């Protein structure tokens, strides 16, 4: 066996670095309601120089529709460094529907012109029945600066009965 090579993990950078929770919050009760202005309902900035080649950034976020007016739609967008890595369908959500998103972003190069590849999914509906999955190549992501991770939500119509609440949000290195 070659020195420094773990046959269980091969070339995985996990051999060199243990996973780390970067951010986690739950129960903030932050809501987006009565507005057609899109809102970053969940947001975290990965610190500058944190990401290394081989890192995997795992993102999980969960929201609940508290109230919905008629046929108004909600569109969730998961973003990494300002780029959409998954855009949910604009759905006529119902009260108590959920929005669940996850993503794995793999760092392939670091520096001022860093590159990454992402696989992400957004599920929306009472049981997460409507699923949108996307693979995205990310370029020009400056890992020497902070990188924002965001869930953006947008209602199609402003109405006092259009309410969505963030329930939990986490970002970790795995």
Predicted ranges, named:
Residues 1-2:
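Sec-dependent, cleavable N-terminal signal peptides
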Residues 11-174:
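Surface-exposed molecular-recognition determinants
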């Amino acid at each position: 066996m070659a020195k420094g090579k773990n046959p269980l993990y091969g070339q995985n950078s996990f051999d060199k670095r243990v996973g780390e929770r970067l951010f986690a919050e739950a129960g903030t009760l932050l809501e987006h309601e009565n507005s057609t202005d899109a809102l970053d309902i969940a947001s975290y900035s990965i610190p500058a120089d944190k990401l290394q080649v081989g890192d995997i950034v795992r993102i999980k976020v969960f929201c609940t529709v508290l109230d919905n007016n008629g046929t108004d739609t909600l569109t969730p967008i998961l973003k990494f460094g300002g780029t959409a890595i998954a855009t949910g369908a604009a759905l006529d959500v119902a009260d108590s529907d959920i929005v669940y998103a996850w993503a794995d972003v793999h760092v392939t190069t670091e520096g001022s012109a860093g590159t990454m590849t992402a696989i992400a999914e957004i599920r929306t509906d009472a049981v997460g029945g409507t699923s949108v999955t996307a693979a995205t190549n990310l370029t020009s992501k400056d890992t020497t600066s902070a990188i924002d991770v965001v869930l953006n939500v947008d209602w199609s119509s402003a109405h006092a009965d259009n309410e969505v609440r963030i329930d939990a949000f986490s970002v970790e290195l795995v």
